[in-house]
C-alpha cells in the first residue's frame, strides 16, 4: 500500500451492480478547507470563537487568540468507505454491500490537502441510480494481524491511525511537534439533504476534515499543544473527541471543497 491521496482509491474500487448499462457516476473527494461557518457539532459551541485558518504555501495556519498551529502534514488511515443508500440502516448490515456504493474496504493512507491546495483530486466511478444519505467509513488503527502488508509499506502507521506534523506557538514561543493517535472509530457523515444519482448523471460528494477544531481545549476557547494530545498526554481524550466530530460530507458540484 502506497502513501496516497484519495485519487489512488480508484485502484481498489469494488462496486456492486455495475453490469447495468443505465448507470450514473459518483465521485468522492477530500478537503481540509474550513467551512464558511462552522457546522453544528460537538467541536464547536454557540459561545466559542472559531479559529481562523490561513493558507501558507503548502501548510495550513490555525490561529486563535495569541496562539497558533502550523500544520505541515496530516495523514489519516481510512477503511470501509461507503456511500449509504437512503433505505439502508447501515452499510455493514447487508452482506455483499449491494445497497451501498463501496469506495474502499482495506486500510488506505490518505494525505489531507493543506495550504493552497483546497481539495484532493477526485475519483469518479460507475454507480447504479439511487438516493444516498450518508458517507460511512472507519478511522482505522492498523493491526499486525489484519494489515500486515499495509504496515510493511507504511511502518510509521503500525497501530497508528493519524499522524500530523507542524509547529505550535504559544504567545510567541514555538515548538515543533509530531502528533499521533490510535483512534479506531466508525464514522457516519450525514449529507445535509439526500442526494440522488440518475442514470447518465453524476453526483459529487466531498468529505471535509475540519482540522481547525482538532486542537481546541475542552471549553473550545483556546488551542492546545498537539504534542500534549499524544498517547498518555493531558489532552489525549479531548483531541480524540474533537477528531471524531470533525467530519462532514456534502454535495460539491463546484469541486471547490465547499457545500453546493
Regions found by a protein language model. Give the residues of each.
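A short, solvent-exposed, low-complexity linear motif enriched for acidic/polar residues
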Residues: 19-260
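Bacterial N-terminal signal peptides that target proteins for export
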Residues: 1-7
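C-terminal motif of bacterial Sec signal peptides marking the signal peptidase cleavage site
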Residues: 14-17
Amino acid at each position: 500500500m502506497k502513501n496516497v491521496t484519495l485519487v489512488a482509491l480508484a485502484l481498489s474500487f469494488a462496486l456492486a451492480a455495475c453490469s447495468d448499462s443505465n448507470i450514473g457516476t459518483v465521485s468522492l473527494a477530500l478537503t481540509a478547507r474550513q467551512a464558511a461557518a462552522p457546522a453544528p457539532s460537538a467541536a464547536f459551541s454557540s459561545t466559542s470563537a472559531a479559529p481562523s485558518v490561513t493558507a501558507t504555501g503548502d501548510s495550513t495556519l490555525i490561529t486563535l487568540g495569541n496562539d497558533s498551529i502550523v500544520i505541515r502534514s496530516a495523514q489519516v488511515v481510512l477503511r470501509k468507505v461507503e456511500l449509504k443508500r437512503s433505505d439502508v440502516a447501515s452499510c455493514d448490515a447487508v452482506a455483499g454491500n449491494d445497497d451501498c456504493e463501496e469506495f474502499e474496504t482495506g486500510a488506505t493512507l490518505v494525505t489531507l490537502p493543506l495550504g493552497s491546495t483546497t481539495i484532493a483530486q477526485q475519483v469518479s466511478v460507475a454507480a447504479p441510480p439511487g438516493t444516498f444519505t450518508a458517507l460511512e467509513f472507519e478511522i482505522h488503527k492498523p493491526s499486525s494481524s489484519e494489515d500486515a502488508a499495509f504496515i510493511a509499506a507504511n511502518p510509521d502507521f503500525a497501530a497508528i491511525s493519524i499522524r500530523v506534523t507542524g509547529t505550535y506557538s504559544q504567545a510567541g514561543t514555538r515548538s515543533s511537534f509530531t502528533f499521533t493517535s490510535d483512534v479506531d472509530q466508525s464514522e457516519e457523515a450525514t449529507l445535509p439533504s439526500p442526494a440522488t444519482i440518475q442514470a447518465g448523471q453524476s453526483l459529487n460528494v466531498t468529505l471535509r476534515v475540519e482540522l481547525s477544531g482538532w486542537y481546541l481545549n475542552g471549553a473550545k476557547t483556546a488551542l492546545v499543544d498537539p504534542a500534549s494530545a499524544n498517547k498518555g498526554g493531558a489532552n489525549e481524550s479531548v483531541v480524540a473527541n474533537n477528531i471524531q466530530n470533525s467530519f462532514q460530507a456534502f454535495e460539491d458540484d463546484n469541486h471547490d471543497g465547499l457545500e453546493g
